[in-house]
């Protein structure tokens, strides 16, 4: 009898728990607490995304640049000078031989496009090589095996093409957003500098001799466009192709003559073509880096300032050159 009472009490307890237990569990779930044997109620954690740089990737020089370049070699002297002028030279790890600007002196040299120093290129470890001229196919294959991307572009042949190149350089080094701003700002700065050096007084004529025959700066050239913008009248501006027509040689009689540095004045004064020209007789012949004028860089503009000061005595923006050396006509 006593055992039956115990069993009845036990069954009653089970029934009570069955009815009440569901309500208790339901209340716990309403409070956000799950049954111990149920799945854990872990709140969703939002995924942390890396910030997106709007500058990259960017298309520059017709190639996609996926990320900011850190090590760049340059295989063309003028291109290296443009990059230096724009303030990106810290990213340049190597330059070609025969760069004419001071900043290039401290950079490792990698030869030239025609005679590249592949060991020097390998040591420099560039991500990119920028160039105006194409490497030979065999060299290009070796560079590709070094995981170097070679980007070849056209050299500028006019002021407009130079402006476009400056903008592409900015895109390459600074990206799609910053590069646009930096490129436009630099072009505006360059145009302002070009306008500021121009001479507006009474003009004189000048000849720019490359070699002692008929080779000189003529019209239809990048050099002539820059000289004209600066207020210099090129005596050969009506001709083209860097050659003054032999049949019209009598027309060549400028007030001032500028010679490439490798031409000696004595050779000019004893040349049948030049010895009777007014500038030669008046000792108005000067050596100047004519090739540098054709680059169109900041250094080019500085040279043109000195050319202007030499041609026009009242021009104060530059320093006049001394005659190449005392002329045989000098008294």
Model-derived regions, located:
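A short, structured surface patch at a secondary-structure boundary
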Residues: 70-133
């Amino acid at each position: 009898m006593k055992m039956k009472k115990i069993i009845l009490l036990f069954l009653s307890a089970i029934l009570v728990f069955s009815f009440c237990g569901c309500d208790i569990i339901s209340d716990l779930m309403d409070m956000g607490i799950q049954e111990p044997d149920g799945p854990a109620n872990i709140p969703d954690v939002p995924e942390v995304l890396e910030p997106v740089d709007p500058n990259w990737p960017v298309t520059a020089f017709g190639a996609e640049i996926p990320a900011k370049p850190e090590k760049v070699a340059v295989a063309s002297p003028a291109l290296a000078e443009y990059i230096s002028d724009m303030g990106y030279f810290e990213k340049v790890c190597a330059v070609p031989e025969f760069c004419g600007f001071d900043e290039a002196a401290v950079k490792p040299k990698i030869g030239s496009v025609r005679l590249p120093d592949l060991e020097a290129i390998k040591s420099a470890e560039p991500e990119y090589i920028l160039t105006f001229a194409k490497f030979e196919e065999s060299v290009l294959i070796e560079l590709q095996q070094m995981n170097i991307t070679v980007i070849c572009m056209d050299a500028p042949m006019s002021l407009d093409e130079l402006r476009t190149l400056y903008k592409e350089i900015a895109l390459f080094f600074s990206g799609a957003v910053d590069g646009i701003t930096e490129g436009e700002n630099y072009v505006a700065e360059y145009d302002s500098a070009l306008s500021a050096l121009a001479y507006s007084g009474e003009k004189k004529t000048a000849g720019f001799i490359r070699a002692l025959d008929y080779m000189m700066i003529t019209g239809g050239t990048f050099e002539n466009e820059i000289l004209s913008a600066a207020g210099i009248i090129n005596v050969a501006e009506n001709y083209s192709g860097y050659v003054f027509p032999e049949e019209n040689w009598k027309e060549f009689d400028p007030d001032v003559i500028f010679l490439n540095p490798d031409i000696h004045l004595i050779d000019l004064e004893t040349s049948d073509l030049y010895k009777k020209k007014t500038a030669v007789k008046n000792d108005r012949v000067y050596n100047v880096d004519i090739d540098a004028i054709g680059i169109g860089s900041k250094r080019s503009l500085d040279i043109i300032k000195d050319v202007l000061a030499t041609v026009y005595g009242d021009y104060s923006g530059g320093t006049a050159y001394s005659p190449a050396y005392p002329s045989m006509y000098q008294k």
